Amino acid sequence: MTAKYHIGIDLGTTNSVLAFAPADESEAMIAVLPIPQITAPGTVERRLSLPSFLLRFEGALDPAFTIDGFRSPYGVVGEYARRIASEQPDRVIAAAKSWLCHGTVDRTSPLLPFENESPELRLSPLDATTAYLMHLVDAWEQQFSDAPFSEQRIVLTVPASFDLDARELTKHAAITAGFPEDFVFLEEPQAALYNWIHAQGDAWRKQLKRHDTLLVCDVGGGTTDLTLVQVTEEQGELELSRLAVGKHLLIGGDNMDLTLAHVASQLFASKGHKLNAWQSTSLWHSCRLAKESLLSAKAPNSVPLNILGRGSKLIGGTISVDLDRAIVESTLVDGFFPVVSLHDRPIESGDTGFQEIGLPFEPDSAITKHVAAFLGDHLHKTPNQRISHLLFNGGVFNATSFRDRLVHTIGSWNQTSQDSLTVLGGIDDLDQAVACGAVYYLWAKDHGGIRIRGGTARSYYIGIESTGPAIPGIPRPLHALCVVPHGMEEGTECVIGNKEVGLRTGKRARFRFFSSTTRTTDKPGQLLKEWDDNELTETPPMETELAATDSPGLVPVKFESRVTELGILELFCKSSRTDQSWKLELQVRSAD
């Protein structure tokens, strides 16, 4: 059945947005879906975003917290959950998206709320993500009953730095929520750029020229995403090609909220109030609301922070301090966007043997240092190449002070006064940009609009165990064979050199895969015998049994790889002795 609508969904750490447009219009008529949600017991209101918060209950859900036609298997999603988080922090799940990409925990196990140890209230990051997506699907079905969600063309955006496992978990959550099997992922920074192109119309070609280099800096509630895009020319027409994406950086609005909570706790301490763990978590949520107010366009000079006193709700009362806008701006601007040189680098993690289990926030919160490191890895290795344009995305950049500081810092890195930095403006709402850009991506694909080229955002490798005498207690060294080069276009294939490798068949085996965002020049068939720890990232291994033609054992094979139009890496292991072939598959798409 032909889809009636293009739908783009920004599944955000703090807020989620659904945008849509009729599929058959000659112009992209993009709108944002008002999302029904509980705002108070017994009250349902429509908002243009869905706060990514989930209030948990023991037992059946009270009818005052239900919406007709909405599935609510896990609790209350949206505005009421966000609002109540400061009062009941141990019952509200927040930052599930950040936990979904936390590779050192089981993201399918009940972990959240992290502060609550009750098994009845805890939920997995995967299930929490499913709850948010389920609410969005139900909101669509309620308002477009003649156009079932599963029959539309859907794009779900993810951070450019999301690894394979995080994308697979997100895909699982989406399918469970009611997405069609053929929905696609799109990188959030690319979606933001598509939104800017849509906002400019044909005028974007007058603002950019050949050899310009764009930095998309996307700082959201949980992550910082960096993407480089270069303007190229093909047969007289300007084109956009992605050069690189940054590493996964767990820095965003959540870190800022924690920073303000630390500042506020000192204010409470100066009044003789030492906060306990429950109060500290409550303060974190209160600081999130305060930050949003104090950094808004019409911000007050200060906001009160009210925390329940120790003891019961009735006996303890509340304690309060005022948080000043000037302190908030100076603390966050200097802490997260300090003026640094192009050669400054973020500090590495500590060497403490034991660390508390929790979200793996970056040890260094200076976003400007991470930008410098990113450009050092991908841009400034080429002489005379510089950033010519900057595109902001993410709710953090609603604050003018953050934008101004980043422009000043990056501008200071350019070598001459003529190397000016141009900010790409004209975006009315940064909170809706990604969802709207995802819709325009689909429209452009169908109607011949500009497409951002770039292929795979990473290079991919398979782990090959080396041969040699066994040494007791020492595993054999592992080599990495490049099977997909950086930027390999979807729909293409390549032969992986002439190297023969032994493939284990007839027995369950563990296949190890790696990816890299920094090794952009490795060729198919290139064998790495050693690499720096920060160059390759191992993805979750694949354990499977490949059928044996004869007796189980090692079969000499050569490789061919193909990246399909759906973003699947197909690795063909072809026998060097017979016509037998085996295929392994990995999802590698973070953008089409």
Language-model segment annotations:
Residues 309-380, 449-592:
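Acidic low-complexity intrinsically disordered segments
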Residues 28-177, 258-304, 308-350:
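Phosphate-binding loop and its immediate beta->loop->alpha context
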Residues 1-109, 184, 235-240, 247, ...:
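Early-domain small/polar-rich strand-loop-helix modules and first-structured segments
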Residues 1-4, 184-217, 376-379, 432-451:
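Conserved phosphate-binding catalytic cores of ATP/NTP-utilizing and phosphoryl-transfer enzymes
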Residues 131-147, 192-207, 335-387, 405, ...:
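Phosphate/ATP-binding catalytic cores across multiple sugar-kinase/actin-like superfamilies
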Residues 140-145, 153, 160-164, 168-223, ...:
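Hydrophobic, small-residue-rich alpha-helical packing segments that form membrane-like cores
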Residues 178-191, 360, 406-437:
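Conserved phosphate-binding/catalytic loops in two-lobed NTP-binding clefts
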Residues 154-169, 308-312, 359-364, 383-409, ...:
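Glycine-rich phosphate-binding loops at beta-strand->alpha-helix junctions
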